[in-house]
Amino acid sequence: MGDFLVAREPLQPSDTVIVLAGNSIYRSQYGATLYQQGLAPRVIVSNEPVRTHGLDSTWWELKQLGLSSIAVPDDAILAITEVSGSTFEEAQHSRDIMRREGWHSAILVTDPFHTRRALLTFRSVFEPAGLTVIPAPAEGSKYKTDGWWRDPDRGIRVIQEYIKLPYYLIKRQI
């Protein structure tokens, strides 16, 4: 059950890495790693508020202050300026940036338990626009496909994903 949520495909060079919003440092760290490995010359990040450790900022502001884990030069980062209330909206905003920049391919970084729904969502938005996306589950994440039910936080996340999958299907967002 935990394995199904994790989507993996071989990584290949792309036009950009997209790091999805969320309060997981592993996403931004892995996005930076993929950039540093030369898999993409640009990184798209969300500019959502940071709601962890009592911070009142955004990921982009933290990056500019040198406090973010995204070790990527500022000129290689594009921030989604619109507020995204869902993975579907992040996909739409990312698609718009990619069209504007003339890009065609992306590597999608998110937590492992989120990759299945995120990939289906992004493909539903990207494919009609002629764009491609490859999933990249964030390395270093504490999510484990076995024994997830033993940890209340992980258990809640898995259950939430299994609720969101049919919801997104019904809403035609995947």
Where would I find each of the regions flagged by the language model?
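A transmembrane-helix-recognition feature enriched in membrane-embedded lipid enzymes
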Residues: 151-174
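A structural signal for short, hydrophobic/glycine-enriched beta-strand patches
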Residues: 2-150
